[in-house]
Each structure stands twice: as C-alpha cells, then as structure tokens.
C-alpha cells in the first residue's frame, strides 16, 4: 500500500520514517516534505502545499490508500472533511473538531461546559476591560492570542507591565494578525508540564507514550516561547496514577463532550497539561495533531506498526489493539537557526549529517531543503537529534553526540534537554 503524509516538519519526517517501516507499505509520499523525507528509504516528496486541499485530495485519490495529517493548519481548514466527502481514508479531526486547537476561546468554553479541569480564565476583544481584569488578578498571569500562532501566541507575564504590553500588542496592535483579535487571559498554573497524546476513533482512546517538551528558547527555561526546543519520552511526572487521572478527568470527558456537541473526534489528540504537586492535571491547551518535537522521541520508542494503529482507528476499533513501546527513555534535541524564534537566515549549508548518521540515533529533518545537491536550512527549527538510552542521561548524552557532529552558520541548541527527568534519576527532585 501507499501512504500520504501531509506536512514538512520534524513531526512529518518522524511519521514518514515510522510508516515506511511497515513491510506492507511500498511508498510513503510526503507533501511537501523536506530534505530528510526526500532521502528517507521508501519516501518521496510531492510538491503540494499543506493548504492546497483540492490538489492533495486529487493526488491521494490517484496514488495512495491512506493519508495521515501532520500539521494543524490543513485540519482547521477542513482537509479531513474534503477527503471524507470524496471517500478517501484520512486520519485526523474534521474542521469542527479541530476547533479544539483552532480557537483557544472555544476550548476554554468547552472545558468549562464539561467541567474539565483548566486554569480560571476570561476572553476579551477590547483593551480596556482586559486591562481592568489584569489589575484585578495581578501577576504572574498568562495571555494567549485566540487563534493559531504556530505555538508562539502565548505570553507568560511575570509582572503587570509585561501583561499590559502583551494585551495592547495582541488587541490594539494585532501582533499575530487575525489570531490576536481576541485574547484569553488565564491564571498562571504552578507545577510540571507534560504532553499527553492519544489516538481517538470517535469513541475509543489509545494512549501514546507520554512526553515532555521544552518550550523556552534558552537553557533553564529562559527566554521567549518557541514551537519546542526538544522533548523526551516518557515523562516521569506522569505516574501510573496520574496517567489514569488524565484519562478519566481530561481525555474521556473531552472525547464524549465533542461527540455530544456534534463534533465526533477522530485523529491524534494532544493535551498539554500542568500536573500539580498532588498529581492533579489541568489542561493548558489542546492540539488536534501530534506534537513537534514530541513525535520524534515517541516514534523512536513505538514498536508497533503506526499504520495498523491508524487503520484500527479508522475502523473504530482502537479498543481491539494495543501499542507496544521500547521501555527505554528517548531524548530529542532541536537544532535551530540563529535568531529563532525571531528573524533568522535561511539557505545556510548544513554540514556533518553523514557523520551524525554513522552514530546510534536518528536525526530528523524539519526546516531543511535540498539545493544543488546540498542540504540547506529553510526554517527556524532545522533538525531534531534523537537518541534512545538505558537512562534519560544516557539518551541525552547520545542525542548531544549527534548534535555536536552537525554544523552550519548560526546553528544553536539548548544544552539541558531532559534536565527535570535527569534530576529525578539522580534523586535531586
């Protein structure tokens, strides 16, 4: 069989790499893909943009038996609705269900309706009432642009000056284009974050391995938020007890609530959670797709066929399958372009990929392209060096061995990915 993966990031390279391992799969097409998917075994890039929905459907109808969607934008735009109208097998939520990511205000109101634990919040479209609420609440406080802002439309303000600036920026200045025309202001939650990703078939849920990502650009979680600078799996904060609480208090009520409201959810569902000291989870955000960079370490740990799991989900039979995992921890370190998450150069030649490929581990491509036979940078997050180990510290060391082989003008990465789990291993926390 042939499979189409929609997207061009590190997540899509990891999904394509995993799908290609299934012996039944002859070819994996990636639209539009990157330099990593261009050279991956059994994979081929197709020059179709992720938002060219009609072209994607035409291609899928002629060439593949199954489509898996990577990024959020085509989901929110209705790619699943279009494929289903044409009778094409595709794994992902409809546009209605993808509102869980497409609108933070929709999500907060949904959580409140279904009594799913989350931070206290209010929605605003005008500056003055928003500022008045800030002064009532005090800092630290969180300000979020309502729509899709590539994971960067969230400001954690540690004082009221920062909070006011963020509100004025998003509402008066519309810093994030249309996404900022409404803001959600919510309480600052204390605790440890975890990424809890599941597959959903409309009714049944199959949990993926847990993970934790590192949103801040700098070591020690300093600097601005990014799309994610690295991740590890599993997340030790999600104990067996916390795992069950997340399913009972967050995931099942969400899947039931969406179905009750006429938005039956199929696809990957990613709950970004804050776990407090007592093990109680609260929802920070939902994403309607696999996380990036969490996909990379999670796919390295997945021993089951991803294709089989997706087929089970499309047959509404996720209760009949189990996923098997390598128990060893895996760490992924993102190599980024100088200046990210602000302005950065593109087109820098990347060296050392062959040396890294000779080591244990896997370098997944994200913002890369092929130019005159060379791999060059084409995005802010460029690569993700991913390795497995007997411990988190062993996996981390191996991931950094891979990263150290790779060079380009302006390359940088965090040096402390996995630090919380390593502190736990050493009995420091």
From Swiss-Prot:
Annotated binding of ATP, by residue: 134-195
Keywords from the named record: ATP-binding, Ligase, Magnesium, Manganese, Metal-binding, Nucleotide-binding, Purine biosynthesis
Record EC number: 6.3.4.13
Keyword Ligase part of the UniProt annotation: yes
InterPro entries, sorted: ATP-grasp, ATP_grasp_subdomain_1, PreATP-grasp_dom_sf, PRibGlycinamid_synth_ATP-grasp, PRibGlycinamide_synth, PRibGlycinamide_synth_C-dom, PRibGlycinamide_synth_C_sf, PRibGlycinamide_synth_CS
Cofactors required: Mg(2+); Mn(2+)
Residues in ATP-grasp domain copies: 108-315
Top class in the EC scheme: ligase
Catalytic reaction annotation: 5-phospho-beta-D-ribosylamine + glycine + ATP = N(1)-(5-phospho-beta-D-ribosyl)glycinamide + ADP + phosphate + H(+)
TM regions (residue ranges): none
The organism's place on the tree of life at top rank: Bacteria
Residues given in the record as Mg(2+) binding sites: 285, 287
Pfam families: GARS_A (PF01071), GARS_C (PF02843), GARS_N (PF02844)
Any GO BP annotation: purine nucleobase biosynthetic process
Family: Belongs to the GARS family.
Stated name of the protein: Phosphoribosylamine--glycine ligase
Gene: purD
């Amino acid at each position: 069989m042939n499979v189409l993966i929609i997207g061009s990031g590190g997540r899509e390279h990891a999904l394509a790499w995993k799908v290609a391992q299934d012996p039944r799969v002859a070819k994996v097409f990636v639209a539009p893909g990157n330099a990593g998917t261009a050279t991956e075994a059994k994979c081929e890039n197709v020059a179709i943009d992720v938002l060219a929905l009609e072209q994607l459907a035409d291609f899928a109808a002629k060439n593949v038996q199954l489509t898996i969607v990577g990024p959020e934008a085509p989901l929110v735009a209705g790619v699943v609705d279009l494929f289903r109208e044409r009778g094409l097998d595709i794994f992902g939520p409809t546009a209605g269900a993808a509102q869980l990511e497409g609108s933070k205000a929709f999500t907060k109101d949904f959580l409140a309706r279904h009594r799913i634990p989350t931070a206290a919040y209010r929605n605003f479209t005008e500056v003055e009432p928003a500022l008045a609420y800030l002064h009532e609440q005090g800092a630290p406080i969180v300000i979020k642009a309502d729509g899709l802002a590539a994971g960067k439309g969230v400001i954690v303000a540690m004082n009221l000056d920062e909070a006011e600036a963020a509100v004025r920026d998003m509402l008066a200045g519309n810093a994030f284009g249309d996404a900022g025309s409404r803001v959600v202001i919510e309480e600052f939650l204390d605790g440890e974050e975890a990424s809890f990703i599941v597959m959903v078939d409309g009714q049944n849920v199959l949990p993926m391995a847990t993970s934790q990502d590192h949103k801040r650009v700098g070591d020690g979680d300093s600097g601005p938020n990014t799309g994610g600078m690295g991740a590890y799996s599993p997340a030790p904060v999600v104990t067996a007890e916390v795992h069950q609480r997340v399913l009972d208090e967050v995931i099942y009520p969400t899947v039931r609530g969406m179905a009750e409201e006429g938005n039956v959810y199929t696809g990957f569902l990613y709950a970004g959670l804050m776990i407090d000291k007592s093990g109680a989870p609260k929802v920070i955000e939902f994403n309607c797709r696999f996380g990036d960079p969490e996909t990379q370490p999670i796919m390295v740990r997945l021993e089951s066929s991803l294709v089989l799991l997706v087929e089970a989900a499309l047959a509404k039979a996720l209760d009949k399958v189990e996923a098997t995992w390598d128990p060893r921890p895996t760490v992924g370190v993102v190599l980024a372009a100088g200046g990210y998450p602000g302005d950065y150069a593109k087109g820098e030649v990347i060296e050392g990929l062959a040396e890294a490929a000779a080591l244990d581990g896997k370098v997944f491509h994200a913002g890369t392209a092929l130019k005159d036979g060379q791999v060059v940078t084409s995005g802010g997050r460029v690569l993700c060096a991913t390795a497995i180990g007997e411990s988190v510290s062993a996996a981390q060391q191996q991931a950094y061995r891979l990263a150290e082989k790779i060079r380009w003008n302006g390359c940088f990465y965090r040096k402390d990915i996995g630090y919380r789990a390593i502190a736990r291993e050493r009995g420091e926390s």
